[in-house]
């Protein structure tokens, strides 16, 4: 199973969500395969959000069993509004299409705890089979 990345993303294990339809596709596919999703909602102009990119990528590299998504709140406003994102960065843990945890703010230790706990509690071991076209 492999996640194919969009052009320009390089070796990143974090998938950038470009539109609402992509969000729905990623969350649905991960849910259908029993994989959790961790989503980072940020903005290109938000320094605290940008400061979390390295840690988020690091977590994605060490947890291939979880689908990591990045959503720019300015580019995908509909999803940001649906989830009630009011500050950046905001991180969501999603399982079976439901938000099970939310962290607001640049707190790398808390995000790591959330990711580590989700990997253990969900007992997933293989990466989601998501293809980005």
From Swiss-Prot:
Query: Pfam families annotated for this entry?
Result: Thioredoxin
Stored InterPro entries: Thioredoxin-like_sf, Thioredoxin_domain, Thioredoxin_H-type-like
Question: Record's Gene3D superfamilies?
Answer: Glutaredoxin
Enumerate the spans annotated as Thioredoxin domain: 1-120
Superkingdom field: Eukaryota
PROSITE patterns the record matches: THIOREDOXIN_2
What protein family is recorded?
Belongs to the thioredoxin family.
Protein name per UniProt: Thioredoxin-like protein CXXS1
């Amino acid at each position: 199973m492999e996640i194919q990345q969009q052009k320009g993303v390089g070796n990143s294990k974090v998938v950038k969500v470009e539109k609402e339809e992509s969000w729905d596709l990623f969350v649905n596919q991960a849910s259908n395969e029993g994989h959790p999703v961790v989503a980072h909602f940020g903005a290109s102009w938000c320094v605290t959000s940008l400061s979390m990119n390295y840690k988020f990528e690091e977590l994605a590299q060490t947890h291939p069993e979880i689908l990591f998504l990045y959503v720019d709140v300015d580019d995908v406003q509909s999803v940001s509004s649906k989830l009630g994102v009011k500050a950046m960065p905001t991180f969501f843990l999603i399982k079976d299409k439901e938000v099970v945890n939310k962290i607001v703010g640049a707190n790398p230790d808390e995000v790591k705890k959330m990711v580590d706990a989700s990997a253990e509690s969900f007992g997933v071991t293989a990466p989601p089979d998501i293809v980005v076209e």
